[in-house]
């Protein structure tokens, strides 16, 4: 039996999971303050949910999807990204109904799966934090979504991120751009990669997202979508940029930005971080945009929508360098040491009382010698040690010691039930 994890997966061990919890708690609190509520969707869906949303010619569908036939013969896929499952839930659970407040704003934190080469910040199972907003075509919805991404990264402690932004215009604009790309790439078709030769037929926009050197040499001179924008698309994009200016959110208009999924319409954006010690070039840690037709693709009513997703592994790599405080083990509040007959029962009772009051408290279930218990308290990063022996138990008096400076006080067993008062005395 091969006792090891599959390639492209990692174990997030207890010494690491604390920092993940802090990031997720920060994000959860941030989203709640913006009146976004959590949604949880299945880790797997019917294959068509992802193939229709991501696009049959996208790299995700062509190469990266984990899909299989289950024992009932159903074609199933593990989710490669978060949006499609949320849209499916929006339609299936009729969140478009008039009694549901619009915009319908949700966030999620979930595992996603793609078969790709494992690298720094990207595994075959990775974690995504995302938001989706359904029901508003107003540029304010785009600006709020971008602002939330910007402010969340700042609140988490990311320091050198840069917003890249572009627009894909409306359907008419994209058709004109599609034809221009076909005209540009067709004469050099035989020099393109096999994937891009197929994309030229199915969706030439995907060629712009190619990482193959055979394709990349043609990209600098490729048509730019800004040259095909109509007046409405220009006005929409300019209004978004103007509001970002007024909010003090810096950006770079990036003509090469197309995003890797077929469902995007209108504004698209990425927040990128450049760190040569992690990646050779600037890398996206948050990306999103508008997708006004995906709900209809899933047989729902016409519904404008916008959202973003964060790759949590990449985010954690950046934060480890830029916000190391996040990764410090803060330890527990109390460790109860005990020695002597009858003290073990009292130790567990004290731990229970402290935990009920909201403190982190532990004791030694193995009942090692006192020296070993103090060693464990130190290893667990306890801020205070409560010592309980037969004498203390008989007298009903405990000793509490603050390990940072050695300050000690005596307290009665009854004082344990109001530990906040004791803590105030210790601070004084």
From Swiss-Prot:
It catalyses: tRNA(His) + L-histidine + ATP = L-histidyl-tRNA(His) + AMP + diphosphate + H(+). One of its GO terms (molecular function) is transferase activity. Keywords: Aminoacyl-tRNA synthetase, ATP-binding, Cytoplasm, Ligase, Nucleotide-binding, Protein biosynthesis. It comes from Lactobacillus helveticus (strain DPC 4571). It is found in: Cytoplasm. Homodimer. Belongs to the class-II aminoacyl-tRNA synthetase family. One of its GO terms (cellular component) is cytoplasm. Its EC number is 6.1.1.21. It is an enzyme of class 6 (ligase). It holds the Pfam family tRNA-synt_His. It comes from the Bacteria. This is Histidine--tRNA ligase. GO terms for biological process: histidyl-tRNA aminoacylation.
């Amino acid at each position: 039996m091969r006792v090891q994890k599959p390639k492209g997966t990692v174990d997030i061990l207890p010494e690491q999971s604390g920092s993940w919890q802090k990031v997720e708690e920060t994000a959860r609190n941030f989203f709640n303050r913006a009146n976004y509520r959590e949604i949880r969707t299945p880790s797997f869906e019917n294959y068509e949910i992802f193939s229709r949303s991501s696009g049959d010619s996208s790299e995700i569908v062509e190469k990266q999807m984990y899909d299989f036939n289950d024992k009932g013969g159903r074609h199933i896929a593990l989710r490669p990204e978060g949006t499609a499952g949320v849209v499916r839930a929006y339609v299936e659970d009729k969140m478009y109904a008039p009694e549901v407040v619009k915009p319908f704003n949700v966030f999620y934190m979930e595992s996603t799966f793609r078969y790709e080469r494992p690298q720094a910040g990207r595994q075959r199972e990775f974690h995504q934090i995302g938001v989706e907003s359904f029901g508003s075509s107003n540029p304010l919805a785009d600006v709020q979504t971008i602002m939330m991404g910007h402010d969340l990264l700042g609140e988490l402690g990311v320091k050198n991120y840069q917003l890249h932004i572009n627009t894909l215009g409306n359907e008419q604009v994209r058709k004109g751009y599609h034809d221009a790309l076909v005209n540009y790439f067709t004469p050099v078709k035989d020099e393109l990669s096999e994937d891009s030769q197929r994309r030229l037929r199915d969706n030439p926009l995907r060629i712009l997202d190619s990482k193959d050197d055979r394709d990349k040499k043609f990209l600098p001179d490729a048509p730019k979508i800004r040259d095909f924008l109509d007046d409405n698309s220009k006005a929409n994009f300019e209004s978004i940029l103007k509001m970002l200016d007024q909010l003090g959110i810096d950006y770079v208009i990036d003509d090469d930005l197309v995003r890797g999924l077929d469902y995007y319409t209108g504004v698209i954006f990425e927040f990128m971080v450049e760190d040569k010690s992690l990646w050779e070039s600037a890398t996206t840690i948050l990306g999103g945009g508008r997708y006004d037709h995906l709900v209809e693709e899933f047989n729902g009513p016409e519904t404008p929508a916008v959202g973003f997703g964060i790759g949590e592994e990449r985010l954690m790599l950046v934060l480890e360098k830029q916000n190391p405080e996040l990764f410090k083990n803060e330890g527990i509040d109390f460790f109860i040491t005990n020695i002597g007959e009858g003290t073990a029962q009292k130790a567990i009772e004290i731990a229970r009382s402290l935990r009920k009051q909201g403190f982190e408290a532990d004791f030694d279930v193995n009942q090692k010698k006192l020296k070993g218990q103090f060693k464990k308290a130190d290893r667990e990063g306890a801020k205070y040690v409560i010592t309980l022996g037969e004498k203390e138990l008989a007298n009903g008096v405990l000793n509490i010691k603050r390990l940072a400076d050695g300050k000690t006080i005596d307290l009665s067993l009854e004082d344990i039930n109001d530990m906040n008062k004791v803590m105030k005395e210790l601070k004084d």
